[in-house]
């Protein structure tokens, strides 16, 4: 599983918006993806911002899955 797949899975399970730090914590705690870098939150935030066709920003740092 890659970052994008892990983000989609977490947001699908939640069925609502989450802050990108919370998304990252859930990905790591559930073992969906093993981060390689020092700042996995930044990686998740980048994926969310760069994929507006998949993720909608609802407030600062908070995103939901576009269905």
Outline where the language-model segments fall.
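Charged low-complexity interaction tracts in eukaryotic proteins
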Residues: 1-9, 14, 18-21, 27-67
């Amino acid at each position: 599983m890659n970052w994008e797949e892990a983000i989609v899975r977490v947001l699908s399970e939640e069925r609502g918006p989450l802050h990108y730090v919370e998304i990252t914590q859930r990905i790591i705690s559930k073992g969906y993806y093993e981060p390689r870098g020092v700042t996995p939150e930044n990686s998740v935030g980048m994926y969310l911002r760069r994929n507006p066709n998949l993720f909608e920003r609802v407030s600062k740092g908070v995103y939901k899955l576009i269905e």
